[in-house]
């Protein structure tokens, strides 16, 4: 039985939730998100709360209910507060700049890298070695951050590359003769 699914999701003031079968739409100040929930989950809306439960006769329904509750909670937090992800570039000559709807990266390749940002994601560069991604969709921000990091993941000897701000890169010792 899922402890996560048992807790209801509170709907704050200014957030509008629409249930249409298994599709849930959350609209708030920062934007609008929509998601289709698994058929094994029963969603009920009571005033300013959403409750999740399992459908009878489905094997992993409690697990799916917990997952659905976490996803919907992230949607509610996203449209009220939003999410941010910070990336740090470490290395000689590694730079980032915003170019329209893309992030321009200089990462030691023979060519500059342009990463196009999807709709709903905003990027800013407080300095040449920092990228801050903001948006209301937690999953999309994480995916964009992972895509940017994949251009130059931090290497374990000198730590050069693109890392998350909260990431701790374990370093290795150099080979000894």
UniProtKB/Swiss-Prot annotation:
Annotated GO CC locations: cytosolic large ribosomal subunit
Instruction: Read off the Pfam families from this record.
Output: Ribosomal_L6 (PF00347)
List keywords of the entry alphabetically: Ribonucleoprotein, Ribosomal protein, RNA-binding, rRNA-binding
Q: Which gene encodes it?
A: rplF
Recorded hits in InterPro entries, A to Z, give:
Ribosomal_uL6-like, Ribosomal_uL6-like_a/b-dom_sf, Ribosomal_uL6_a/b-dom, Ribosomal_uL6_bac-type, Ribosomal_uL6_CS
This chain belongs to the protein called Large ribosomal subunit protein uL6
Purpose of the protein: This protein binds to the 23S rRNA, and is important in its secondary structure. It is located near the subunit interface in the base of the L7/L12 stalk, and near the tRNA binding site of the peptidyltransferase center.
A GO BP term, please? cytoplasmic translation
């Amino acid at each position: 039985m899922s402890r996560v699914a048992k807790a209801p999701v509170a709907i704050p003031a200014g957030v509008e939730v629409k249930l249409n079968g298994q599709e849930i739409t959350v609209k708030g100040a920062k934007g609008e998100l929509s998601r289709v929930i698994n058929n094994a989950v029963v969603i009920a809306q009571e005033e300013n709360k959403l409750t999740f439960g399992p459908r009878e006769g489905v094997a992993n329904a409690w697990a799916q209910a917990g997952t659905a509750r976490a996803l919907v909670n992230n949607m509610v937090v996203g449209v009220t507060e939003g999410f941010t992800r910070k990336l740090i570039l470490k290395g000689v000559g590694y730079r980032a700049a915003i170019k329209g709807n893309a992030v321009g990266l200089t990462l030691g390749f023979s060519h500059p890298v342009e990463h196009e940002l999807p709709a709903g994601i905003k990027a800013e560069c407080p300095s040449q070695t920092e990228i801050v991604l903001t948006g209301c969709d937690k999953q999309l921000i994480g995916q964009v951050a992972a895509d940017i990091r994949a251009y130059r993941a931090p290497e374990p000897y000198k730590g050069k590359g693109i890392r998350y701000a909260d990431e701790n890169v374990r370093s290795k010792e150099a080979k000894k003769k």
